[in-house]
């Protein structure tokens, strides 16, 4: 779901899930780093009265209010960039979905942030799976995702967060999983 099927046999279906290491995150982390460091250096240049930037001279700016504003934007941009780089280094959200008929178990595994929830692992019985549910919302912020409906639990998301997968890919993955588990596909 969001990744390729790693192992598929008549007994085991394993699907890798892409986490935070996506091109869009690398792109925005790079842009935020450049912008944040640039604003930070511009603010510090106005404070020290010494040019710390290569591309322009910001020593002529008054520290209050322009330099303070530049420092604020620099700290904010660098914080966002740091968060993005950290999530990519930890590969938050990555993992796998494994459906094992031999052991009769469904294992949903994801990596989280450090702490007690670093390893997120949900294990259910295949017999408890009621259906595979496809959720499709179009509009400004489209959402296309697959969920596993399990008895006495809320729906478990199977697809990665972020960019929605194509409709045909969603249909194919949902149908493949429903066929493998022998349950209905809902929502299409």
UniProtKB/Swiss-Prot annotation:
Swiss-Prot/TrEMBL GO biological process terms: photosynthesis
Signal peptide: none
S-S bridge residues: none
Cell compartment(s), UniProt: Cellular thylakoid membrane
Domain of life according to the entry: Bacteria
Pfam families named in the record: Ycf4
Membrane association type: Multi-pass membrane protein
Transmembrane segment boundaries: 26-48, 63-85
Gene Ontology CC: one annotated term: photosystem I
Keywords: Membrane, Photosynthesis, Thylakoid, Transmembrane, Transmembrane helix
Function: Seems to be required for the assembly of the photosystem I complex.
Sequence similarity: Belongs to the Ycf4 family.
PANTHER family: PHOTOSYSTEM I ASSEMBLY PROTEIN YCF4, PTHR33288
Protein name, per record: Photosystem I assembly protein Ycf4
Originating organism: Synechocystis sp. (strain ATCC 27184 / PCC 6803 / Kazusa)
